[in-house]
Amino acid sequence: NVIVKNRSQVFGYYDHNMMVMFERTGDHLKEKPKYTPRQRLWYIRAKEVLLSTGSIERPIVFGNNDTPGVFLSAAAKEYIKVYGVLVGKKPLIFTNNDSAYETALEFKKQGVEPIILDTREEQSSELIDAAKNQNIQIKFSHAVVAANGYKKVKSAQIAHISSDKRNLGKIEKINCDCICVSGFWTPTIHLSSQSGNKTKFDEKIDAFVPGKSKQNETTVGSASGIFNLEETISTSFEKGYQLSKKITNNDNKVSVPQVSEKKFTNHDKFWCVPLPDKKNFKRFLDFQNDVTVSDIELALREGYRSIEHVKRYTTLGMATDQGKTSNLNGLQLVSDVENKVVPSVGHTTFRPPYTPVSIGAIVGREIGKHSKPTRKSPMHSWHEKNNAVFV
């Protein structure tokens, strides 16, 4: 009694637990039957909704970070594990947390020697120790100052960074052909927020998480700010069981699978590398709309204080990705300049669609009960009689 929809994306969460989803039905087929649509739109009204939307890795901001060859660390790992593709043969891993060490270990498995720059002071964890045991070079308290290269990354300028993250040491050059960046993880709360859920800021993970639900909606996993696999599975199974029991009166519990994972240590609350003296590198926050750190600083100097005003002045988060990797870094910048905490700065509004959807899928041809009568002007019949051209 379970329907699984592959190649599908819920892009809007509306009142009365109505969700709108588009299904990609034809684009992936080499030979598709006649009249097969490219996409199909679904209107779903649910008694209960369980959101397991995950989280998105966020970058660390540094100079020339829009140079081709700069990747999110998780993306580089996925290229290796899912597609068998190496994004580079001289990778530089730049991180403030343990998850990027998994990427470094994947490179090592493929016979590639990565170098890790960790903004944290030297410490130990299961993943850090695993990297050391593989003889992976690790530079603690170091940061990428800027990427070098015109059409692709050819090297990087790196430096020791002070414990307060405000001062850089002597800059040195290190050869690399890609830079894999990890600035920790941001819960994907867009659908939860669209449902009317009031978000709250979690100081532990430096990100917003769902607060009290307004509709019959429950968020689980990393979308709720839980990044431990064992806890994610146990809480998700429990909440799923409670919802199933509520809807079906079925009291059959499902055994929770046992998992083993390497434990992560705390991440570094660091998101942007300071500019060195007499340097003016472009440091991009929003890659789609080319919004830089200096753009945000200018908006604040011009007197814009509300984050919604800063957003509109700079177009931060207004591209088709709606700031999925940039919004939180933008909020951190505003809070730093204004000497405020992030919750007092607020956050921008999440609006549907979560991902772009074609107008053709929304308009449709076979719309059934969602048909709406065509409204015509009082002059319509006269226009028809006089052979008007309708556009």
Predicted segments — roles?
Residues 1-374, 378:
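Residues forming the flavin
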Residues 371-391:
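N- or domain-start disorder-to-order transition segments that initiate the globular core
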